[in-house]
Amino acid sequence: MYGGICLCVLLAVLAISSSGQHISRSLNGNSLAAAIEQNFPEKHRPARTPDSNQRVESNIDEKANLGVLLARYLQKARRGTNGKPPDPKKESQDYLGWMDFGRRSAEEYEYSS
């Protein structure tokens, strides 16, 4: 249950961060930014943001890191709650005799034909 909740939260954070980037990019081309640059002298201007090439590189790095984190999360989710990978032998032993149930009960009654 926690795995599903974590995945939903992760997707929500990704959606919010990507929508936030679109909003900030649309504001960069706004005439308001041009008016602010004209009104403030060079000394009082805030430091400029990195150019678009650096933004693209940082976005690629963030996506790569996110991919690594997602892969780790999926590996942990597969392992289960105890941190050990599931044992295929144990899973098959749980249902070893279920197919023989009908045959054994039929042998007990020994129907005559």
UniProtKB/Swiss-Prot annotation:
PANTHER family: CHOLECYSTOKININ. Pfam families: Gastrin. SMART domains: GASTRIN. The lineage of its organism: Eukaryota, Metazoa, Chordata, Craniata, Vertebrata. InterPro entries: CCK-like, Gastrin/CCK, Gastrin/cholecystokinin_CS. Keywords: Amidation, Cleavage on pair of basic residues, G-protein coupled receptor impairing toxin, Hypotensive agent, Secreted, Signal, Sulfation, Toxin. It comes from the Eukaryota. Transmembrane segments: none annotated. The modification Sulfotyrosine is found at Y95. One of its GO terms (molecular function) is toxin activity. It is found in: Secreted. GO terms for cellular component: axon; extracellular space. Cholecystokinin-22: hypotensive neuropeptide that binds cholecystokinin receptor type A receptor (CCKAR). Cholecystokinin-8: hypotensive neuropeptide that binds cholecystokinin receptor type A receptor (CCKAR). This is Cholecystoxin.
